[in-house]
């Protein structure tokens, strides 16, 4: 594993900010954003170090949520485990897999992540609001349409994996040639 340095700190913090901005830019369209796309691309290129960007994204989301709601909004807590799940799935893709396979798997993982977002969010809802089984099923079924929208949005966003992946690979190769630390 490469040594972590200042350049990496700036790079992965910037990616974390991009994750947050991709969420904000599409705010008017429920559950459509570029977070899954960026998690996939950053993880394909930078592998395990991509988790840093996800943690930065979660911290920015937490701080803005707490500031905007004067400390009374906890909806971001499930992000602590929901987005690392997608990262883990992408980490399971072998480094040497053909790019077409990587893109196909990321598209499937992103779609499933969007479709199952409500299911992954449910444990927090059950604990936070003391939901019984009937209430949990009602909450989950009320959000199915939003999970379907989330899935479709994630799959559509994944059409950008190839150009973003190629761009990041070129930038990383250029960085290696110039020996930036």
What are the functions of these language-model segments?
Residues 13-17, 37, 41, 54-62, ...:
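Residue-level signature of the transmembrane alpha-helical core
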Residues 23-30, 51-57, 91-107, 160:
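Hydrophobic alpha-helical transmembrane segments
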Residues 1-45, 51-52, 59:
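Hydrophobic transmembrane alpha-helices
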Residues 40-45, 87-92, 163:
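Transmembrane alpha-helices and membrane-interface helical segments
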Residues 72-77, 92, 99-181:
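Membrane-embedded alpha-helical hairpins and interfacial helices in multi-pass inner-membrane proteins
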């Amino acid at each position: 594993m490469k040594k972590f340095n200042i350049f990496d700190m700036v790079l992965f913090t910037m990616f974390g900010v991009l994750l947050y901005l991709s969420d904000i830019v599409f705010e008017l369209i429920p559950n459509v954003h570029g977070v899954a796309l960026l998690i996939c691309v950053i993880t394909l290129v930078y592998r395990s170090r991509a988790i840093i960007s996800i943690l930065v994204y979660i911290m920015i989301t937490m701080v803005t949520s707490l500031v905007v709601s004067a400390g009374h909004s906890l909806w971001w807590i499930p992000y602590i485990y929901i987005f690392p799940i997608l990262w883990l799935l992408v980490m399971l893709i072998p480094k040497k897999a053909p790019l077409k396979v990587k893109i196909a798997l990321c598209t499937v993982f992103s779609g499933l992540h969007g479709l199952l977002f409500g299911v992954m969010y449910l444990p927090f809802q059950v604990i936070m609001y003391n939901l019984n089984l009937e209430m949990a099923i009602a909450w989950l079924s009320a959000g199915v349409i939003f999970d379907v929208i989330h899935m479709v949005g994630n799959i559509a966003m994944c059409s950008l994996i190839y150009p973003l992946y190629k761009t990041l690979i070129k930038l990383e190769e250029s960085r290696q040639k110039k020996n930036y630390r």
